[in-house]
A protein has these predicted regions:
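N-terminal cap/lid segment of alpha/beta-hydrolase-fold proteins
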Residues: 19-45
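The serine-hydrolase catalytic nucleophile loop
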Residues: 58-70
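Conserved alpha/beta-hydrolase
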Residues: 72-91
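Catalytic nucleophile-loop/oxyanion-hole region of alpha/beta-hydrolase
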Residues: 88-114
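The alpha/beta-hydrolase serine catalytic core
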Residues: 130, 140-165
Length: 165
């Protein structure tokens, strides 16, 4: 259980960081703070024609995209990360982490990206991957990297209801 606690503490530390310059290997990682349709966002990396949309999972935040950006940016990508409702800079806000809230928001973020970059890819985790698959199923993506995606929400909920407390 200690490992889980360490990951939670690391996520909390990452989620407290703000935009600016982050150390990425031996060079500073350029970040820009943005707001897309009222959604707090960070853009990592120097100007490019390619971008990854980074969508975190439960208990995550846009700042946790930094380790991924440290890999993607040297490969010629920028990374656009957003805070889902009730996460990161949106903690305590009135928006709830519900499909009918998160899906239209991710559609708006995709539209923002598609207007600015030639190639849009997705990197999403867990519940963020599920929301992204709902929002972007008809959108052209260059690629998708899904980490622990929820692919069958109904089955997940049914199984969770059978867990012993």
């Amino acid at each position: 259980m200690k490992g889980g606690l360490e990951v939670k503490n690391l996520n909390q530390q990452l989620c407290r960081k703000k935009g600016g310059r982050h150390l990425a290997g031996d060079a500073a990682m350029i970040t820009q703070k943005l707001e897309i349709s009222g959604i707090p966002a960070l853009l990592y990396g120097k100007e490019s024609r390619k971008v990854y949309l980074y969508v975190h999972g439960k208990m995550g935040c846009k700042e946790e995209a930094l380790p991924f950006a440290e890999l993607a940016c040297p490969a010629g990508y920028q990374v656009l990360a957003v805070d889902l409702p009730e996460h990161g800079d949106r903690r305590g806000s009135s928006e709830k982490l519900l499909p009918w809230v998160a899906v239209p928001e991710l559609e708006a973020v995709y539209s923002y990206a598609a207007e600015r970059w030639k190639n849009v890819s997705l990197r999403a985790t867990s519940i963020g991957a599920w929301f992204s698959m709902l929002a972007l199923q008809e959108k052209p993506l260059r690629g998708a990297l899904l980490l622990s995606p929820v692919v069958d929400m109904e089955n997940l909920i049914t199984n969770m209801m059978q867990w012993q407390m």
